Amino acid sequence: MAEKFIQHTGLVVPLDAANVDTDAIIPKQFLQKVTRTGFGAHLFNDWRFLDEQGQQPNPAFVLNFPEYQGASILLARENFGCGSSREHAPWALTDYGFKVVIAPSFADIFYGNSFNNQLLPVKLSEEAVDELFALAQANPGIHFEVDLAAQVVKAGDKRYPFEIDAFRRHCMMNGLDSIGLTLQHEDAIAAYENKQPAFMR
């Protein structure tokens, strides 16, 4: 059972870049592992570090700024998560500590993979995202509240409603991944299997 997502208040980091692809999120050389942990160390590796080994932080990259350490909400531009399909991208984001990504648009496969991994992708209009960038950049260290139950982002004194598929919202709020969804029908599955002839079990 995955962690339930009802509401989250967290530090916001503004990544002012459009078309951030999955190879930028987690470069291909770090995809060998099949567990979901450990990828956060390599998140945005080519941007966060000056060396391939990830030992020399790039002081010019926003995630390395002291005021954004511990950020759990990523603010980005349009078409976030484009490029090749890799579930490692949301793995890296969640392992780093992100709970929410806010952007005007997402690549379709990344969008779906995010829900499967309890990372909430919030789509807002470009105008709303522009306002949030201005607010976050003028107030380093600001926290936003993302209320999935009410489907609203609260930032400063403004509220930004967002739309989300009802089924995906239900799964996020109840901590249901694909396994959890199946287990909701465990009794029915067991009853069906018990009706089958012994040679089919």
From Swiss-Prot:
Molecular-function GO terms, alphabetical: 3-isopropylmalate dehydratase activity
The keyword DNA damage belongs to this UniProt entry's keyword annotation: no
InterPro entries per UniProt: 3-IsopropMal_deHydase_ssu, Aconitase/3IPM_dehydase_swvl, AconitaseA/IPMdHydase_ssu_swvl, IPMI_Swivel, LeuD
EC class name: lyase
Pathway membership, UniProt: Amino-acid biosynthesis; L-leucine biosynthesis; L-leucine from 3-methyl-2-oxobutanoate: step 2/4
Catalytic activity from the UniProt record: (2R,3S)-3-isopropylmalate = (2S)-2-isopropylmalate
Gene Ontology terms: biological process: L-leucine biosynthetic process
Record has Lipid biosynthesis as a keyword: no
Summary of the function given for this chain in its UniProt record: Catalyzes the isomerization between 2-isopropylmalate and 3-isopropylmalate, via the formation of 2-isopropylmaleate.
HAMAP family given in the database record: LeuD_type1
Assigned protein family: Belongs to the LeuD family. LeuD type 1 subfamily.
Quaternary state and interactors: Heterodimer of LeuC and LeuD.
UniProt name for this protein: 3-isopropylmalate dehydratase small subunit
Origin species: Salmonella arizonae (strain ATCC BAA-731 / CDC346-86 / RSK2980)
Gene that this sequence comes from: leuD
